């Protein structure tokens, strides 16, 4: 396994000018305010009675969502968190504000769907909603249709998994390639993806289709290596998977291990900043 992380802003970092502009715009906003990696925000949260709704969510994770975050603590996010699909896979700590019913720690959830309501900012799976309760109060909490909550983005942790790539069923090899990223750690967004044949320095960029899905119509022949630009701190960083990620004859529907994991934390702009762990 070979992993290297480098600052992305150099003369040869991004060959495509439009992508470079996109990265700069995405990374410039946090510089305009005090940096914080634990911005606490307020909203309301409801819950789905069936978690199947979230595993079949608009992020497109399918059955893989059942393996995220312990397999059940999932959420659908409103527009501010969903961000047109860019927010797919992000992790949040959510707690309700009724201290009689709810614990201080709350529940940690991962976004797998878009909330189809404007009444709440989050719709949790029923296990996640119940997990916000104090001991013995879960039944009372779930009797409520929705509750006031506060939440903050937190790093996703997949201790026993690397960042993985699933080749979408729509891919038509060897040139038409669509992939989705699974088990993305850290507290970042992937803002650019390049692929190249292993051993080659001729990188080609992929285009974001939606959320964790990226595609290209002119994929180089395999085996393929990858490099990503992720937000981290106030900057962007290259994450290199300079090994065989996709084999020469990759197959649609298969999941491949990149051999790397993301641990960076991107800064947000907010005040005050919550630096305390919710316990």
From Swiss-Prot:
Glycans are attached at residue 118. One of its GO terms (cellular component) is extracellular region. Its main location: secreted. It comes from the Eukaryota. Residues 56-161 form the Expansin-like EG45 domain. It is found in: Secreted. It holds the Pfam family Expansin_C. CDD domains: DPBB_EXLA_N. Belongs to the expansin family. Expansin-like A subfamily. This is Expansin-like A1. It comes from Oryza sativa subsp. japonica. The lineage of its organism: Eukaryota, Viridiplantae, Streptophyta, Embryophyta, Tracheophyta.
């Amino acid at each position: 396994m070979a992993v290297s992380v480098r600052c992305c802003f150099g003369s040869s970092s991004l060959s495509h000018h439009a992508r470079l502009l996109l990265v700069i715009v995405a990374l410039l906003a946090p510089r305009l305010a005090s940096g914080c990696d634990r911005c606490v925000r307020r909203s309301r949260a409801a819950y789905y009675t069936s978690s199947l709704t979230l595993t079949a969510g608009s992020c497109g994770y399918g059955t893989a969502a059942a393996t995220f975050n312990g397999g059940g603590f999932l959420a659908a996010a409103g527009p501010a968190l969903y961000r047109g699909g860019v927010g797919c896979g992000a992790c949040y700590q959510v707690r309700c504000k009724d201290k009689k019913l709810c614990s201080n720690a709350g529940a940690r959830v991962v976004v797998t769907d878009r909330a189809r309501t404007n009444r709440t900012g989050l719709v949790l799976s029923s296990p996640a909603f119940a997990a916000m309760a104090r001991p013995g109060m879960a039944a009372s909490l779930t009797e409520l249709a929705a509750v006031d909550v506060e939440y903050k983005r937190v790093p996703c942790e997949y201790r026993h998994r690397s960042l993985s790539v699933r080749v979408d069923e729509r891919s038509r090899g060897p040139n038409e390639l669509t992939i989705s990223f699974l088990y993305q750690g850290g507290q970042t967004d992937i803002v650019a993806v390049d692929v190249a044949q292993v051993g080659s320095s001729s990188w080609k960029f992929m285009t974001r289709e939606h959320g964790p899905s990226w595609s290209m119509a002119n994929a180089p022949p395999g085996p393929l290596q990858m490099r990503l630009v992720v937000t981290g701190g106030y900057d962007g960083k290259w994450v290199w998977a300079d090994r065989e990620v996709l084999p020469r004859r990759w197959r649609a529907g298969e999941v491949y291990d990149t051999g790397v994991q993301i641990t960076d934390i991107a800064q947000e702009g907010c005040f005050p900043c919550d630096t305390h762990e919710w316990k």
